[in-house]
Amino acid sequence: MDHLYVDEAHSYKNAFLYTKMRNVAGIAQNEAQKSADMFNKCQYLDEITGGKGITFATDTPISNSMTELYVMQRYLQNSKLQNMGLGLFDSWASTFGEVVTSIELAPEGTGYRAKSRFARFYNIPELMNMFKEIADIKTSDQLKLPVPEAEYETVVLKPTEQQK
């Protein structure tokens, strides 16, 4: 086998991140076994094909956090990340972003709490140029897919006795 085609590649986004960052929203500290298995296969194919043995297909490479972009790059551009000194997540994160702590309303709604998240981004053109080496990005305007007209209907109901 010298090439791996992976459809629905977003299913493998839960790869472990070696990081010193703790309690930062969007940075998972758990790993799915299937993601570890996929990473090992990608590493092997990169070695025997010179980085040309893997094709990922997905319409949602990034859905919840920037860590998902790093994970996709790690699968498909690991050698490049290593050569650039960005192989570890903390190096990648400090090059392309910053953790920002802000005060937010607590989920219970009874007070406030400090919440840290990977929220400020830097070097976006460089990051996008790297990502475009492995991604064929198409916008809805480029695809020109038919979009059905929406039919909106408002239905007003009286509350039940329990809801009052």
Predicted region positions:
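Inter-lobe coupling linker of SF2 helicases/translocases
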Residues: M1-H3, E31-N64, Y75-K164
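A short beta-strand element within the Helicase C-terminal
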Residues: E68-V71
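Conserved ATPase-coupling elements of RecA-like P-loop NTPase cores
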Residues: S11-K34, S65-M66
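Walker B catalytic acidic pair
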Residues: D7-E8
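Short, low-complexity, polar/charged sequence segments that are solvent-exposed and flexible
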Residues: N23-A25, Q73-Q77
